[in-house]
Amino acid sequence: MPKLKTKSSAKKRFKVTASGRVMSAQSTKRHGMTKRSKRSLRTRRGIAQMSAPDARIVASFMPYSL
């Protein structure tokens, strides 16, 4: 059976930790930040853990991530 390919878009956007959690950057940080509150912008710094249903989908894009 041939090797499964990892989707390039997924490996650029997501990181899988050693414990199997899928991490991603916060959304809504591209443009239009002057409208948003400073608190909203602060909470979107760094990376966040994805929800379980979304993480399962992303994990299927990266078959050798675990």
Curated annotation (Swiss-Prot):
Source organism superkingdom: Bacteria
- Fetch the SUPFAM superfamilies from UniProt: L35p-like
Which GO cellular component terms are attached? ribonucleoprotein complex; ribosome
Q: Does the keyword Ribonucleoprotein apply?
A: yes
UniProt xrefs under PROSITE patterns: RIBOSOMAL_L35
Write down the InterPro entries for this protein, in alphabetical order: Ribosomal_bL35 (IPR001706), Ribosomal_bL35-like (IPR021137), Ribosomal_bL35_CS (IPR018265), Ribosomal_bL35_sf (IPR037229)
Does Mitochondrion show up as a keyword for this record?
no
Q: What are the UniProt keywords, alphabetically?
A: Ribonucleoprotein, Ribosomal protein
Region (Disordered) location: 1-49
**Where in the sequence does UniProt note compositional bias of the Basic residues kind?**
1-15, 28-45
One GO biological process term: translation
Q: Which GO terms describe its molecular function?
A: structural constituent of ribosome
- Give the residue range of the signal peptide: none
Family, according to the entry, reads as follows:
Belongs to the bacterial ribosomal protein bL35 family.
Record protein name field = Large ribosomal subunit protein bL35
Q: Which organism is it from?
A: Anaplasma marginale (strain Florida)
Q: What is the lineage of its organism?
A: Bacteria, Pseudomonadati, Pseudomonadota, Alphaproteobacteria, Rickettsiales
Gene symbol? rpmI
